[in-house]
Regions:
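Beta-strand elements of modular eukaryotic interaction domains
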Residues: 36
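Domain-length cofactor-binding catalytic modules of enzymes
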Residues: 2-31, 40-45, 53-59, 63, ...
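A generic, well-ordered mixed alpha/beta core segment in the N-terminal half of proteins
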Residues: 73-139
C-alpha cells in the first residue's frame, strides 16, 4: 500500500506530511504539523506505518532538510539500529532447552547499565574511534564532564547491549535456518553527545531571529560552527553504534559456539541504523535526511524490521520509493507508553504472550509485552510499496536490556 493520509499545508511555509498508514495518534499528528512548519524542510515529511509520538520528534518520521539539521530529531540514541546474520545451522540443531545458550550470551554481553570490566573490543575498532573523538572533545570539553570515567566508559561499553527495548535474539526463518539478531545503539557517549547538542541548539535558538514552533525543533544552520561540530560528533556516534553492534555480534557467536554444532556465518549479514542522519540525493536535490525510527530502503538494499517480543520479524529488500525518501519502518512501533503498559498488563500476561520463547518473564520487562506494540503484520501490509519481504523470522530466544 502507498500513502494513505496527507496532512496538507496549514501555514505559509509548511510542507505536506505524507503518511503510509491510517493508524496515527493525535499527539503524533500535532508533532508532525509543527515540524512541517520549519522553512528548511524540503518537499514533504514522510511518515512510516510504525508511527508514534516521540521525544523531540515523531518516531517513524523521515525528515528531509536543506542547509539545517535538528539534533532532537536524531535524538539521544544516535545510530541506534539492528544487526542480523544467518548461520549455517538448522533449527533442528538447536538444543530443546535454550537456557544454557541464553546464560552463555548474558555472561558474555553486558546488558542494561553494565559494561565490560576490561576493554573487549579489538584495537582495530578502538583506535580509529579514539582518533576521531579527540578533536570533538577538544572543541567541546563539556562532553567529558557529562560522562563518568569518560575514556574507560566509552571503550568498555563497546560491545554492550544497553537497556529499554534493546535486545539480542536467536530466530528461525521460513527455511528453518538460524539467525542471530540484535538491536542497540551508541550507548552512554551517544546519549551524552545527543543531549549536549540538543541543549546547545535550544540555547542558540533563543538568540536567533525567526520562529521555531517547538523548542525541540531547535536547529543548527549549515555554515555555522555548531552545525559543523554536530555533524562531526553525530557521525562519530553513528560509527560507534555500528561498531558496537559488530562487537556484540562477535561476542555472541563466541559465546554460543561451544554449545552448538560447528557452524559458519553466511553472507546474509545486515547492520543498519534507524535513528540517524545522512547526506543523500532525492528529487535531484542534495539533502540531509534524518530518519527518526526508520531505515533506508534503497533499491534492493537489505534491512531489518523487528516485531515485538513474541512476534515475527522481517529481513526486507528496499524498493527505493521516492515518496518515502527510500525509507521504511524500523519495527512495529509502540501503541502505548511504557507506563500505560505496566498498568494494563501483569507478569502473567507476559508469560502467556511469550510462551515458547526463552526470555525474561518477570515484572521488570512487562512494558515490553507484545500487546504494547502495533500488529507487525498490519505494519508490513501498509508498506508493501516500500519493501519486499526476503525472510520471515520467529524468535526462539530473547535477551532484553
Amino acid at each position: 500500500m502507498g500513502i494513505q493520509k496527507i496532512l496538507n499545508k496549514e501555514a505559509l511555509y509548511s510542507v505536506p506530511v505524507k503518511i503510509f498508514t491510517q493508524d496515527t495518534d493525535s499527539e503524533s499528528i500535532e508533532q508532525l504539523k509543527k515540524m512541517a512548519q520549519l522553512q528548511f524542510i524540503y518537499s514533504h515529511i514522510a511518515v512510516m506505518p510504525d508511527v508514534h509520538v516521540g521525544k523531540g520528534a515523531t518516531v517513524g518520521s523521515v525528515i528531509p532538510t536543506k542547509h539545517a539539521i535538528i539534533p532532537a530529531a536524531v535524538g539521544v540514541d544516535i545510530g541506534c539500529g539492528m544487526n542480523a546474520i544467518r548461520l549455517s545451522l538448522k533449527a533442528s540443531q538447536l538444543p530443546d532447552n535454550l537456557s544454557r545458550l541464553r546464560d552463555a550470551i548474558e555472561r558474555k554481553v553486558p546488558v542494561g547499565f553494565a559494561l565490560h570490566k576490561q576493554v573487549k573490543a579489538k584495537a582495530s575498532s578502538i583506535i580509529p574511534l579514539e582518533k576521531r573523538l579527540e578533536p570533538i572533545i577538544k572543541k567541546h570539553p563539556g562532553l567529558v564532564r557529562m560522562l563518568r570515567q569518560f575514556d574507560a566508559t566509552w571503550q568498555k561499553q563497546l560491545g554492550t547491549l544497553g537497556g529499554g527495548n534493546h535486545f539480542i535474539e536467536l530466530c528461525i526463518d521460513e527455511n528453518q535456518d538460524v539467525w542471530v539478531m540484535l538491536h542497540s545503539g551508541s550507548r552512554g557517549l551517544g546519549n551524552v553527545i545527543g543531549t549536549y547538542f540538543i541543549e546547545l541548539a535550544k540555547k542558540e535558538a533563543q538568540h536567533r531571529f525567526g520562529h521555531v514552533p517547538d523548542k525541540d525543533l531547535s536547529y543548527f544552520a549549515e555554515g555555522s560552527k555548531s552545525f559543523d561540530d554536530y555533524v562531526e560528533a553525530v557521525e562519530w556516534a553513528q560509527e560507534y553504534a555500528f561498531e558496537n553492534r559488530k562487537e556484540m555480534m562477535r561476542l555472541i557467536l563466541e559465546a554460543i559456539r561451544p554449545l552448538l554444532p560447528s557452524f559458519q556465518m553466511t553472507k546474509e549479514a545486515i547492520n543498519c541504523h534507524h535513528n540517524y542522519v545522512s547526506r543523500e540525493t532525492h528529487f535531484g536535490e542534495n539533502l540531509l535526511i534524518t530518519r527518526k525510527g526508520a531505515i533506508r530502503a534503497g533499491l534492493d538494499e537489505l534491512g531489518i524490521i523487528p516485531g515485538s517480543m513474541g512476534a515475527r520479524s522481517y529481513i526486507v529488500k528496499g524498493k527505493a520509493n521516492p515518496e518515502s525518501f527510500c525509507s521504511c519502518s524500523h519495527g512495529a512501533g509502540r501503541k502505548m507508553s511504557r507506563s500505560k503498559a505496566k498498568v494494563l498488563f501483569n507478569q502473567q500476561d507476559l508469560i502467556e504472550q511469550t510462551q515458547g520463547i526463552e526470555c525474561r518473564k518477570d515484572s521488570g520487562v512487562v512494558d515490553e509485552i507484545p500487546s504494547a506494540y502495533k500488529d507487525i503484520d498490519e505494519v508490513m501490509a501498509n508498506q508493501s510499496d516500500l519493501i519486499e519481504v526476503v525472510h520471515t523470522l520467529k524468535q526462539v530466544l530473547c535477551i532484553k536490556g
